[in-house]
Amino acid sequence: MSTIETLRRVLHECRTIAVVGLSPQWHRPSHFVGKYLLAHGYRMVPVNPMATEIIGEPCYPDLRTAATALKTQGITIDMVDCFRKSEDMPPLADDAIAIGAKCLWMQLGVVNEEAAAKARAAGLGVVMDRCVKIEHARLFGGLNWAGVNTRVISAKRPQQLPY
């Protein structure tokens, strides 16, 4: 599941995204992704057993707890975005299936064929070794040196951003 049309459809349809392994530390890649998702209209659900709140959102210790808490509000998790090691993925695939997610997304460097096969067999879309932030920016406009779309085309890095 990595054709441009499929990625675009997944990113358009999946509006509530649980970010498993989201870090409360501002300089971590997962934190950047969480902020990006919020800034682009997604409902981002932090999942990290070591935190109670990240980026102003309540944080849950595991995926099933998050899904149960959100279900009381009438919200379902559409995508599970995983910032975990490849070997940690099979139990997360089981959790994604159990909560009724539509897509299991494994971040850059994360590939696990066993987890992918489980998820696909249950009807989930699977994306491996790709970053949600990068793919969204690439497919919907928004990539440049600073990670945002300045609408300026140049091969030279600007001294200052024009906004």
Give the label of every model feature segment:
Residues 1-3, 54-90:
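Glycine-rich, highly charged phosphate/nucleotide-binding loops
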Residues 40-42, 99-104, 122-124:
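A short helix->loop->beta-strand "cap" motif at the edges of active sites that frequently abuts
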Residues 108-134:
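Rossmann-fold NAD(P)-binding glycine/threonine-rich loop
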Residues 25-28, 35-55:
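NAD(P)-binding Rossmann-fold cofactor-contacting core
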Residues 135-163:
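A charged, well-structured terminal subsegment
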Residues 73-113:
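Mid-chain, well-packed structural core segment of small domains
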